[in-house]
Amino acid sequence: MYFLKKQGTLRIVALLGCLFAATYIIYIPYYHTTYNLLMGILSNILHLFQVVTIDTNIADLYDEIVAGIGNTVIANIYVILLGILHISLPALSALTAVTILFRCFSSVQLFFANQRKRPLYIFSELNERSLQLCKSLMETNCDIIFAGSESDSFSNKPDNLRRVILKDESIAEIAVKFRKSKETYFFCISEDEDESLSYCLQLIEKYATEKETVQPHIHIYQFSRHQDFSVIIDSADNGCLDIRCINEYEMLVYDLLDTYPLTRYAKSDIHVLLHGLNEINTVALRAIAWCGQLSGFSLKISVAGVNIEDKVSELKLSAPGIFTDRYCINFYSCQNENEVIDAISKYCADANYIITSGQSDNATMQESLILRRLFYKLDPEYQNCPPIFCYIKDPSKFNITKNLTTAESNPKRKVSYDLIPFGSLEDIYTYEKLVNSDLELLSRNVHLAYEEIFSDGAINIEEALNRYSIFEVNKRSNRANALHIRYKLNLLGLDYTTEDTDQAVTLKDYYTEDVLKQLSISEHDRWMAFLETEGWVPSSKEDVLAYRNSGISRGRHNCPVLKMHPYICEYEKLEALSLELEGKDTRVYDTELIVKIPDILGDKWNIAKKKFNIIKVPHRDT
């Protein structure tokens, strides 16, 4: 996009030059026959300035020129050409002047932004998502820059964003101009995701060689829906830069599963129905496959949609592990929507958690209403009302769907459809959600808990957090672990909240030997399922010896390049296997993490700057 903007600027300059040349040429017959060569050139150049400034005194010159032309037709054509040039040349000159002044103005803004010590936020592009994120920053004391946006019209910028700086340079070029000591946030959030990745890698290359005192002040957020991009970023030498890969669909699904836990709507059997298998439901399928791993619960996932065979094949290629007997996932690919409804009626009548995502927001709303009526009719007493979560992106349709949630929210209609929308840009693209969400804060605490477990003592928190920033794969694993904490608490009839309460309980009072084992099994099953949804597969002892000897695993028992891990196995087999491979029972790590949940929620390391109180909630058996 930046290259195209530069090309557009060059075209304007070239066009202006052509107009100047055309105006000069068309007056050559007059000035060069009236004056000698030198005076003719100077007079014609002076005349160009008169044209640009719209000097009315040159009107008499037209009459003199036309009078000197004998042919009336040629004279009329000549006058038309003069008129076009005398209109277009001043207009284009004024446009060029405004562009130059605007560029100078934005450069002055950039200079003062560089002198101020307040945080700086730089976006790679001005688009719907970056604009929504920018709005959430407007009330903070910061400077905001949109790269690659200077040639956009001022009218494209909303009134409440007038103090935002627009620059025509790329985000990497702007980065060179700023002091290295201030907190700087780069958001690579272009519509072209390949371009976003390119900008991210350029920024990493620039800052990875900076001093270690500089790198912690640099925060790079790369937005992409492609999971493989994180592998590319992890392979770059990024020092201790704070780099995060933001997957919009993953954020939406994690937020949904955290706000509306699977356990809330099930007593012992979790049955999730996914209507359709597009990108958002594929991400949901992966997350639910590990999120629903709970000792004492069974998990069943049903996916029904029109012609989903190709999507299923892609999923089987990228995550073959979830197609094994350990998982109960059924796919119903139908020829039309009527067949989909028939399949749901026949095989999914006991579903207690439903996610719908159609080809458009309208289709999603329509399908959700059909499913609501269907599930009511499946029960002779019309009491079957599982929650239906609708993926709605458009803000206006999102709000309309919210009115269908309960009768109380839409009293004029007095009708309850119990549809719960998710996916609005206004909900997800905020600074708080992206940077400091509860899940993100807890994931850092999970990382610090692991650091303590594997160091057998006190840790250097700053160095530990730097290690958190190095690999995206570790951050994704920690986020999944943080999300699952709520589910583990639900097994005990507990939950957590950030609100102050006098009803808080102490988790350690609930820890018995049986409870610790139950939660440890749940943690191992969650970890194993998470790896399999990421494409990992089990490896035998022979596999471990082979890739250890080859050097591809760098001596480790697992191999990230091959995505093979020997501990993808039942919990009961883990003790003997880990003793043989490592000489110790690795199940202890699961138990130690469970023991540290109070430290994670209590913000032992003072990273989250908030504490999560543990409270009682209605148990599933009550």
Where does each model-flagged region fall?
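Cytosolic regulatory regions of ion transport systems
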Residues: 1-20, 32-42, 50, 56-526, ...
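Juxtamembrane "helix-exit" motif on the non-cytosolic side of transmembrane helices
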Residues: 26-32
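Surface-exposed intrinsically disordered loops and tails
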Residues: 539-569, 573-581, 586
